[in-house]
Amino acid sequence: MRLNPGEIVRVLETKISDYKEEIRLEDTGKVIQVGDGIARVYGLNNVMANEMVEFVETGTKGLAFNLEEDNVGIIILGDYKDIKEGHTVRRLNRIMEVPVGEGLLGRVVNPLGEPLDGLGPVEYKETRPIEFKAPGVIFRKPVDTPLQTGLKVVDSLIPIGRGQRELIIGDRQTGKTAIAIDTIINQKGKGVYCIYVAIGQKASAVARIVEKLRQTGAMEYTTVVVAASSDPATLQYIAPYAGCAMGEYFMFNGKDALVVYDDLSKHAVAYRQISLLLRRPPGREAYPGDVFYLHSRLLERAARLNEKYGGGSLTALPIIETQANDISAYIPTNVISITDGQIYLEPGLFYAGQRPAVNIGLSVSRVGGAAQIKAMKQVAGSLKLDLAQFQELETFAQFATELDPATQAQITRGQRLMELMKQPQYSPMEVEDQVVVLFAGINGYLDDLPINAVKAFEEGLLKFVKEKYSSLLDEIRTTKQLSKENETKLHAVIKEFKEEFVKLYGK
């Protein structure tokens, strides 16, 4: 084989001309202490607050949290067991971001956007920072569109609007998560994308919820973000912000999104743990001084944008667990003051069989009334006051031997209306069905029925109306109001059904 000197020269010249010397400066530091999900690092002098860093030897990511004079306190996002003293940490020159978009629908992911459901990698085209400034007053418009939960007691008495923040608060095992899951199930076909964020929940409980969402077809428009109780406090801390970023993607693209934070009590506990480990000074109940800001900066990101900015919305349903009904504790009062109302669930009502166990007197929606459809306003206008008065009268009636007819009539109707408010789990109702049922209740059609016949009457009435007068339901759905003509028609329909019902069941 003869070597051509000219050819060799040409190849060498090409290689030399293509050679580009690249000098890259990397800001690195050394781990001086590690444990409990926290690393102290020396040498990262130029690191930004909340900047992502990487532990070179293990590939684990971290978040620069405490910037001190001689070292940086880093919260480790993942397993810290393999990180040792002396390991190298390098800056990534970006703040923390998570994948967003429609590719996450139907998936179960951790707060970093990594899949947990075994369905392969998550497909995404965009990422968003987990911390983002809440939209200002100029970007917003008043809440004016309802977000139907499918629960009679909520949609009639404590209505929620798109863009609202409504707190669900109560003791453990009172049905807080059930209300949130029913709301997600009820968004089917309504163009609302849902994000369910599980913070510090048992993995088995989350698996049950995911399975229920799959069975009802709700996973098609839902993303589940999980930081289970077995995950480090650092992941539990960032979970709600990651879920919020995923919801914001839809809001800023002119769509409607709903995000459930289940629950923020455990989130505050995780933040307290991180803060104490980083030697931040403790305050009331050992929470750090900025625990109010922790939740306010998260919940303020829920908004209804005006048309100029796309008209999208992000509705937030934070959940808070109380201890022994104490809603005046530190975290509950903080979140009550941040949100636009609360749904208060009471163990006493729950164990008495009143489910959802909503305490109507203590629950309120500060902005949702404007979003309620006219038909529901017409039907449920005085319902909250009537039921609150009934509960007082019922307490008083326990001590009275004789009651005047007017008081007795009010108690009779109140008992039947309370029975009407009961609803089994995972069976949300369409708003037009709710209007028909509540119309029958407030107009006294149930007053002469025994309480145990109310459920059968409700089911029978809906079946009867759907079979024979479905056009009436269609009209309520499309016009969103009860015209005088439809009111008269509804009276006639209910009377017709009641005659049949009494014949079948007797009084």
Curated annotation (Swiss-Prot):
InterPro entries for the chain: ATP_synth_asu-like_sf, ATP_synth_asu_C, ATP_synth_asu_C_sf, ATP_synth_F1_a_nt-bd_dom, ATP_synth_F1_asu, ATPase_a/bsu_AS, ATPase_F1/V1/A1_a/bsu_N, ATPase_F1/V1/A1_a/bsu_N_sf
Pfam families: ATP-synt_ab (PF00006), ATP-synt_ab_C (PF00306), ATP-synt_ab_N (PF02874)
PROSITE patterns: ATPASE_ALPHA_BETA
Topology in the lipid bilayer: Peripheral membrane protein
Catalyzed reaction equations: ATP + H2O + 4 H(+)(in) = ADP + phosphate + 5 H(+)(out)
Protein EC: 7.1.2.2
Keywords assigned by UniProt, alphabetized: ATP synthesis, ATP-binding, Cell inner membrane, Cell membrane, CF(1), Hydrogen ion transport, Ion transport, Membrane, Nucleotide-binding, Translocase, Transport
Site positions (Required for activity): 363
GO molecular function, one term: ATP binding
Domain of life: Bacteria
GO cellular component: plasma membrane; proton-transporting ATP synthase complex
Residue positions binding ATP: 170-177
Entry's localization field: Cell inner membrane
CDD domains hit by this protein: ATP-synt_F1_alpha_C, ATP-synt_F1_alpha_N, F1-ATPase_alpha_CD
SUPFAM superfamilies per the UniProt record, alphabetical: C-terminal domain of alpha and beta subunits of F1 ATP synthase (SSF47917), N-terminal domain of alpha and beta subunits of F1 ATP synthase (SSF50615), P-loop containing nucleoside triphosphate hydrolases (SSF52540)
Stated role: Produces ATP from ADP in the presence of a proton gradient across the membrane. The alpha chain is a regulatory subunit.
Recorded family membership: Belongs to the ATPase alpha/beta chains family.
Assembly and oligomerization: F-type ATPases have 2 components, CF(1) - the catalytic core - and CF(0) - the membrane proton channel. CF(1) has five subunits: alpha(3), beta(3), gamma(1), delta(1), epsilon(1). CF(0) has three main subunits: a(1), b(2) and c(9-12). The alpha and beta chains form an alternating ring which encloses part of the gamma chain. CF(1) is attached to CF(0) by a central stalk formed by the gamma and epsilon chains, while a peripheral stalk is formed by the delta and b chains.
Protein name: ATP synthase subunit alpha
Native species: Fervidobacterium nodosum (strain ATCC 35602 / DSM 5306 / Rt17-B1)
